[in-house]
Amino acid sequence: MATNTFKQQVDSIIQSRHLLQHPFYIAWTEGKLTREQLRHYAEQYFYNVLAEPTYLSAVHFNTPHFHNVENSGDISIRQEVLKNLIDEEHGEKNHPALWKAFAFALGADDASLTQADALPETENLVATFRDICINEPFYAGLAALHAFESQVPDIAAVKIDGLAKFYGMKDPDSYEFFSVHQTADIFHSQAEWAIIEKFADTPEKQAEVLAATRRACDALWKFLDGIHENYCANLICEEKTAATLH
């Protein structure tokens, strides 16, 4: 498969499930969510924030040190994944800490973050990414990460704007998680794609990348379905009414 066609297929999968098209995020951009609904979202997504470093650890583990006939990969890939992992967990402003600052600004606390029962869709999100990153080749794991991180810069910009405009969140410390990812994930997703493009060099490997991309996008979409259906009944009623009127 030609490289440009392969990239187009990956991009098409991502665009068909782009998270900014989800009703929950649309409601966010329109200021229709309550702070309580956002808090529930923050508590649920915290499960994924804590799990993200383990996805990277799994890809790092699965990446061979050397490239040969039997194994594709090399130390440069391991180093790139390690840089991403360090970004996630190193220092006082590690990403779980930044997410906690966001959640606390919405009224959450340590107890609500650690004791919130994970929705089935939340459990599915974490389980799906872990399964791909642990049990599939490294380039498929990177495809799952790329499926999400390639969307994040646009999502983060919209979230920051909505938080300031509709929810009075104007302290940069409260939304630093998003501002950090708005920039960092441009580079992360570009690096991930460069590796995928280089090492998914057969039709079979490219098929694995496409399958991982679909699974990741579906799990992310279903996660927002879970938030929307469990915490946003008022919005669902409005949407059904609007659909009926049209």
Swiss-Prot record:
Binding, Fe(2+) 2: 88, 149, 185, 188
Gene Ontology molecular function, alphabetical: metal ion binding; oxidoreductase activity
Annotated site residues (Side-chain cleavage) in this chain: 25
Keywords: Iron, Metal-binding, Oxidoreductase
Details of cofactor binding: Binds 2 divalent metal cations per subunit.
Binding site for Fe(2+) 1: 88, 95, 181
EC supergroup of this enzyme: oxidoreductase
PANTHER family, A to Z: 4-AMINOBENZOATE SYNTHASE, PQQC-LIKE PROTEIN
Protein known as: 4-aminobenzoate synthase
